[in-house]
Amino acid sequence: MAELRALVAVKRVIDFAVKIRVKPDKTGVVTDGVKHSMNPFCEIAVEEAVRLKEKKLVKEIIAVSCGPAQCQETIRTALAMGADRGIHVEVPAAEANHLGPLQVARVLAKLAEKEKVDLVLLGKQAIDDDCNQTGQMTAGFLDWPQGTFASQVTLEGDKIKVEREIDGGLETLRLKLPAVVTADLRLNEPRYATLPNIMKAKKKKIEVIKAGDLGVDLTSKLSVISVEDPPQRTAGVKVETTEDLVAKLKEIGRI
């Protein structure tokens, strides 16, 4: 097969080092004035696409993000890492809070068809909702084979070999292209964007479109009832002997 075109999905999330705070009304988490960055699993997906391009196996990498205007910063990061151009599916901030895997998967599937890509790469999950559904749903809408939790990816002609870690060992899949692959942490270690590449990324093209331009309805079928902090754990009690342990368990009604 000739050189491929790859679509890589990137999500803007609260930075992994930030301590999450729940809103007083428990409708979500505080995002205003909080540092955001690219989802770490998405970084791995971008890195893998760039490595395939460096091997002359991929000719173009398109970075895609859905959400408010700030998502363009996330796309710029992908461009600085080596993506060729970006597509921002603009969604107002109020609506973006209700975007779920189903809506994003519909967008990605439509873009994959529109751009005539051969490979869709994305992180296996996002660290904010941990849904682990978008890649699978995208493959379902496209009716393409999928390789999830990829720990190694190898292009073999018109097929892609995906190794994935499972309980008790490794599973190897060979998927006929076009295909969808989701990245595990073990797939690679993303590079840091260099200053020259960051400057070049500012000149690369980002196309801004609406979900409606793709014929996608972003209305969510789910609603968040409440978001709460995990309950605080009570302090443990140290015991010196087995007899003390049994006595303590009896005292608290465990035995």
UniProtKB/Swiss-Prot annotation:
Keywords: Acetylation, Electron transport, Methylation, Mitochondrion, Nucleotide-binding, Phosphoprotein, Transport. Residues 183-205 are annotated as: Recognition loop. The lineage of its organism: Eukaryota, Metazoa, Chordata, Craniata, Vertebrata. AMP binds at residues 9, 39-42, 66, 123-134. InterPro entries: ET-Flavoprotein_bsu_CS, ETF_a/b_N, ETF_b, ETF_beta_N, Rossmann-like_a/b/a_fold. Transmembrane segments: none annotated. GO terms for biological process: fatty acid beta-oxidation using acyl-CoA dehydrogenase. One of its GO terms (molecular function) is nucleotide binding. The modification N6,N6,N6-trimethyllysine is found at residues 200, 203. This is Electron transfer flavoprotein subunit beta. The modification N6-methyllysine is found at residue 200. Methylated. Trimethylation at Lys-200 and Lys-203 may negatively regulate the activity in electron transfer from acyl-CoA dehydrogenases. Its main location: mitochondrion. GO terms for cellular component: mitochondrial matrix; mitochondrion. The modification N-acetylalanine is found at residue 2. Signal peptide: none annotated. The modification Phosphoserine is found at residues 223, 226. The modification N6-acetyllysine is found at residues 200, 210, 238, 248. SMART domains: ETF. Belongs to the ETF beta-subunit/FixA family. Heterodimer composed of ETFA and ETFB. Identified in a complex that contains ETFA, ETFB and ETFRF1. Interacts with ACADM.
